């Protein structure tokens, strides 16, 4: 759908948000998913319908790279939408996080793939939220409900709560910091750099473990 005014966009997103409270399938009546990717990866595991959203597939080209990149970060109601991306369906494009916030896809389909049975999912938190509008709906998290099997073969790699508590303000940096620090840019930047340095040490420790695994660091899973 292509709203013709800011008011139409606001009304449309209000309707979509209310629909999402009831069901993601109801949200799918308002928004389609468009996947723009490398022609060398057919994404066959995503081609069979897996949720209520109509999914379109398009090839990434030199003509649509920039508008697709812009659309992927275009926040609804804050930024002007992107329209007419070459090689894609006509319509109005916004940040795909509205429906695919943390990419809660049917990774279990890859179990029969020649690429391997396990999916490594580096993440910034210990749970996967399907859509941005689902952030306040914990029952929508991946691993729960009728689609819980989607992540049976996923290894979720995320910072531990203990690590996060060591960071400035005991949290990961995010856009809310701009409001918290206000015009105190020096403190915000200093704390961000501290968090980045600590994260780099965590990265290096993980890389060292991958290169030379230390089984004494492994905690068995109890099923």
List PLM regions with ranges.
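Patatin-like phospholipase
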Residues: 1-223
């Amino acid at each position: 759908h292509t709203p013709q005014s800011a008011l139409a966009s606001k009304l449309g997103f209000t309707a979509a948000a209310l629909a999402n409270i009831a069901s993601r399938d109801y949200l799918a009546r308002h928004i389609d998913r468009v996947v723009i990717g490398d022609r060398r990866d057919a994404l066959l595991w995503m081609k069979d319908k897996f949720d209520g959203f109509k999914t379109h597939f398009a090839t990434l080209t030199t003509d649509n790279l920039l508008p697709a990149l812009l659309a992927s970060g275009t926040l609804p109601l804050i930024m002007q939408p992107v329209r007419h991306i070459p090689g894609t369906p006509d319509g109005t494009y916004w940040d795909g996080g509205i429906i695919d916030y943390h990419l809660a896809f049917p990774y279990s389909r890859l179990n029969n793939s020649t690429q391997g049975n396990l999916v490594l999912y580096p993440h910034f938190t210990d749970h996967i939220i399907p859509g941005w509008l689902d952030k306040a709906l914990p029952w929508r998290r991946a691993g729960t409900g009728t689609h819980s099997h989607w992540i049976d073969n996923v290894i979720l790699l995320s910072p531990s709560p203990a690590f996060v508590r060591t960071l400035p303000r005991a949290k990961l940096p995010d856009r809310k910091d701009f409001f918290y620090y206000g015009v105190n840019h020096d403190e915000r930047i200093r704390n961000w750099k501290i968090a980045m340095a600590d994260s780099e040490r965590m990265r290096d420790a993980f890389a060292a473990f991958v290169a030379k695994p230390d089984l004494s660091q492994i905690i068995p899973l109890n099923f």
